[in-house]
Every structure is written in C-alpha cells, then in structure tokens.
Amino acid sequence: MFYKLAQKVMFQMDPELAHNIAIGSLKMTGNNLLNCFYRQQVKSSPVTCMGLTFPNPVGLAAGLDKDGESIDAFHAMGFGHVEVGTVTPRPQAGNDQPRLFRLKPAKGIINRMGFNNKGVDNLVRNLMAKKSDIMVGVNIGKNKDTPVEQGKDDYLICMEKVYQYASYIAVNISSPNTPGLRSMQYGELLDDLLSSIKAKQTELAAKHGKYVPVALKIAPDLTSEEISAIADSLMSNQFDGVIATNTTLSRDTVTDLKHAEEMGGLSGKPLADLSTQVIKQLAICLQGKIPIIGVGGINSAADALAKFDAGSTMVQIYSGFIYQGPKLVDQIARAYCAK
C-alpha cells in the first residue's frame, strides 16, 4: 500500500528527479525504524551461484544504486543481493538531461544515462560504511573519454579498488550509452579483456586471501554466432558467471508509444522475450559450466520463472521493481521455492 502511494507521487515527477529523491530517502532510512515502510521478510530460498550462497535468487540489477548509497535499505527489502554501479575510475556526469523516460503503458524504461557516477573511490567508501551483510556485486565500466583500445585499464583499476569489498565483480561491456563500449564484446578486444581480468583476479586473490568471482554482463542485441563466440571466450578464460542481459536498442515492441523514439537502452517488460532468448542460447552453449544470472523484463513471478526455465541460476530486477515495488522480491522467491 505504501509503495503504491509513493509510486503515484513519484510518477508525477521527472523520472530522474524521482530516482534521486528515492535513493536519497532510502539512504537516510536504511538503518533506522523508518525502514518499516518497506522492510519485509522474504521467503528463504538459498541458491548457490559462482561458488557463493545467496539467501534467495533475487537480486537488484546494476544502475539503480550506482554509487552504493542505499545498500542497507535494499537489504531490508529482502533482496538476495544488490549489484551496485556501474562505477568508473573517475567521476563522470554522464550524458545530457533529459536522459531517462518512462513508457508506462508497456511497463518499460528508456535510459541514456551514460555511466553517471561519483567514481570508484566514493563507492569504496560506501561499501566500507554499509551495516548489513548482504551480498554486493560491483558492476565496473570504463570512463567515456577512455579510448576503447585502452578500456581494459579502466576495468583493472576499478577491479583492484573494489576487490576486497565485493562479493562478486560484474564487467559491463554492454551498455549502449557509452560510445564504442559494445565493441568490446567481440573478437580480440573481448579475449584480451577477459584474460586480463582473470589474471588480475588471480593476483588479487593471492594478495587478499579471498577469491572474488567475476561475471560478464552482455547485451541482448547479439546474433546466435556472437552469443556462441562470447560463451567460448567465457569458458576459455574460466569466467565465473555471465549476466544476461543489459538493455536493448530495439524498439520493435514499443513502436507507437510516447518516448519510444528516444535514444538509449530500453528495459522493462518489452525486453523480456529478447533477454530470455539470449539466456536460452547461452545455456545451450555453456552446458552448465558457467552460471547465468538472468535479467531483463521481469515484471512478475511468472516472468522470473521463464528466466529460470531458460537456464538462469539467479535473476535480477530493476524496471519491474520500479513498477511493482518490493513485493516482487518475495513473489519471485516464493515462486522459485514452489517450482
């Protein structure tokens, strides 16, 4: 009830303003009695993924809490894990506003944020300050002004700084809002990046006495051949996981809606089938050797079950959380237990 009232107010605002107010409010209330407005007990449904045990298979996708300011609040909502970021080595403002648009009839969102964040050092401070023991994945990216050919260095800088504070690290090369970024999903650029990440992981595991899994986040706008090539590279470089998928550039499912023509990545319900198809193809290619975290268009427990049936070990929500609220976490956890 509280969420529906809050949503009604927020949906009258500019989407980015509403987002900033929400994150600020959650930051202030995450560790005090005011979290009673959203705190909930979620059905226990432990799952093992990437060698880690999560209390339930429902995570918060990257992009909502970019700077890790409200981790404890999302823990109170019962998420099995939170993925913060995308974070870059240096702070950056992102793309010009407006850059966030609701497609309410389709339960979709278009964004062209452009990795706006306060930088990796700020994120590390927030990770150190969190009170809860929730699993936290850190999604890392490159700065916009770093040439793609040198992008690998940005990932390694972020990885070194967040390693000891992260439950796992997600390597984001699939945002459509950073020029040239998606080119890192192919060929020599991909293999060079993954092998460098893996070597850095080995180095940092020895340094900190802690093995932190690494996962690759991929786009939905890939051919079968490209998915197969990515799967081969993941296996040959012994990556621990893959997150499928990021937002899509396709507008096939929202052609006549207001804001559909806006540039950026489309998420939410219109992405559901496309991301599920990618997961199915990945699962065939990976043959159970690398776990898949399914994300994209999960707006109900049934949507989540489709991701599990396609081959996902865990799922993440973002747009569905915006439209449905915290109750979606428990609904998915219960459906997972009952399946």
From Swiss-Prot:
FMN binds at residues 62-66, 86, 139, 172, 217, 245, 268, 297, 318-319. GO terms for molecular function: dihydroorotate dehydrogenase (quinone) activity. Its main location: membrane. The active site is at residue 175. It comes from the Bacteria. The keyword Hydrolase does not apply. One of its GO terms (cellular component) is cytoplasm. Binds 1 FMN per subunit. It is a peripheral membrane protein. It is found in: Cell membrane. It catalyses: (S)-dihydroorotate + a quinone = orotate + a quinol. Pathway: Pyrimidine metabolism; UMP biosynthesis via de novo pathway; orotate from (S)-dihydroorotate (quinone route): step 1/1. Keywords: Cell membrane, Flavoprotein, FMN, Membrane, Oxidoreductase, Pyrimidine biosynthesis. One of its GO terms (biological process) is 'de novo' pyrimidine nucleobase biosynthetic process. InterPro entries: Aldolase_TIM (IPR013785), DHO_dehydrogenase (IPR050074), Dihydroorotate_DH_1_2 (IPR012135), Dihydroorotate_DH_2 (IPR005719), Dihydroorotate_DH_cat (IPR005720), Dihydroorotate_DH_CS (IPR001295). Its cofactor is FMN. Pfam families: DHO_dh. Its EC number is 1.3.5.2. The keyword Flavoprotein applies. Substrate binds at residues 66, 111-115, 172, 177, 246-247. Monomer. Catalyzes the conversion of dihydroorotate to orotate with quinone as electron acceptor. Belongs to the dihydroorotate dehydrogenase family. Type 2 subfamily. This is Dihydroorotate dehydrogenase (quinone). It comes from Shewanella frigidimarina (strain NCIMB 400).
